[in-house]
Amino acid sequence: MRLHLLLLILLLFSILLSPVRGGLGPAEGHCLNLSGVCRRDVCKVVEDQIGACRRRMKCCRAWWILMPIPTPLIMSDYQEPLKRKLK
């Protein structure tokens, strides 16, 4: 009986003290859903920046993907100002 108790306590401590890393952050998951890769600081030459993963990490996706995946755009009421015509 003591052996069972000892194993149970050992199992409990190993579960509580094990290093646990949480899942992906919401921005990282969104980047992966768009077939992107989180990169530090800059994207490669053949990639476009489609968002941000974390501080200093950018979501990059190759612009030449054979099966294009539309990147969701934020809808707003912003309109560009009218340009003046030169006389």
From Swiss-Prot:
Signal peptide: 1-22
Gene Ontology terms: biological process: cell chemotaxis; defense response to bacterium
Annotated GO CC locations: extracellular space; Golgi lumen
Keywords associated with the record: Antibiotic, Antimicrobial, Defensin, Disulfide bond, Secreted, Signal
InterPro entries, per the entry: Beta/alpha-defensin_C
Domain of life: Eukaryota
Primary role: Has antibacterial activity.
Protein name: Beta-defensin 109
Organism: Pan troglodytes (Chimpanzee)
